[in-house]
From Swiss-Prot:
Molecular-function GO terms, alphabetical: iron ion binding
Role noted for this protein: Could be a mediator in iron transactions between iron acquisition and iron-requiring processes, such as synthesis and/or repair of Fe-S clusters in biosynthetic enzymes.
Coiled-coil segments: none
Gene3D superfamilies membership: Fe(II) trafficking protein YggX
Keyword Lyase: no
One Pfam family hit: Iron_traffic
GO cellular component terms given for this protein: cytosol
Ribosomal protein among keywords: no
Keywords, comma-separated and alphabetical: Iron
GO process annotations (BP): cellular response to oxidative stress
Name the UniProt record assigns to this protein: Probable Fe(2+)-trafficking protein
PANTHER family, per database record: FE(2+)-TRAFFICKING PROTEIN-RELATED
Length: 90
């Protein structure tokens, strides 16, 4: 049976994640409030941040930065955009 959540990012009922994608309280909040589709969108955004900002994931500061951006993306004002980023036309 598919688990459904009221996705905080998409603003609608959608298929939920199969397991918490991140440890701790933040992972539980994401599991309870974020859909698979929104999580997939975050992964793409996170990849863009890592590549454009040249983050080294072995560096604890980079991992903490991504965790704070993930929280902002889902529960705050939104995550950072790389300098000069222009969204694609839809």
């Amino acid at each position: 049976m598919v688990r459904s959540v009221k996705c905080i990012r998409l603003g609608c009922e959608a298929e939920g994640l199969d397991f918490p994608p991140y440890p701790g309280e933040l992972g539980k909040r994401i599991f309870d409030n974020v859909s698979k589709e929104a999580w997939s969108q975050w992964i793409k955004h996170q990849t863009m941040l890592v590549n454009e900002m040249r983050l080294n994931l072995a560096d604890i500061k980079a991992r903490k930065y991504l965790a704070s951006q993930m929280e902002a993306y889902f529960f705050g004002e939104g995550a950072d955009q790389p300098a000069g980023y222009i969204p694609p036309d839809k």
